[in-house]
Amino acid sequence: DGSGTVAMLEIAQAFKQASKKGKGPKRSIVFLHVTGEEKGLLGSAYYADNPIYPLENTVTNLNLDMIGRIDPTRKGDKREYIYIIGSDHDSQDLHNLSEQTNLETVNLDLDYRYNAKDDPNRFYYRSDHYNFAKNGIPIIFYFSGTHPDYHLPSDTPDKIEYDLLELRSKLVFYTAWNIANRDERIKVDPKPEVKKFEVDKDILDGYAGNYGAEGIPLKIGVFIRDNNLFIEVMSQAVQLDALADDVFGSEAMGLKITFDTENGTMEFKQGPYNIKLKRE
């Protein structure tokens, strides 16, 4: 519905007006409008690989993706809300700043119902902030939820709740303002070191090929690129992480794949789906 785009433009204009009055932010701000999200977060992935400023100097990513409608469960006297996803995943400091900023400004109901990484909707992994989060950059994903017009031509501007779009845009502006003007950068929470499971290249070669299942129109290609294992499903390539011997997965996609090279099969698990495929 373009709500995130127009909000970003308004926020950029507000920062520019402040800068002209000599009140510009202490930190640089990149207003990033990316495309290809539905094809696999392509635009944000490209930026993460080719950033304007080094990722290690990137303090925070604030992602506005659908902030102009009302979730059917939040109508009536519960309409002044925004779903917050990811604010506490990598930085309690960012989460606290977000909460305090909201209390001191628009005072929306910050709803965390979709915040868990294992939420079955997997919203945390499905929008462009994820390409920053997976690089260790704290993020906040602002989201008003799905609705009957989700991804349909019927999602037209007349259905936008403009008063809520304004409040939500102000919240993001004030949050960005506080982050950009504080003396210290947002603190990232320490993470326990996870040892990566390594697999030799010759073993990876044994998994490569095209897999299919009888009676199911599902084809999965498995290939190696830069000593990493990938699968291709519906023209989308997904890199897999080695989890154990013959076991690979993708946290972002909620995938787990187990290979049986002796029988030339793979077991594909994603959510409620568990499919056995054979190499063709």
Please provide the spans of the model-predicted regions:
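Peripheral terminal and inter-domain segments
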Residues: 190-280
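Metal-dependent peptidase/peptidase-like ectodomains
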Residues: 34-141
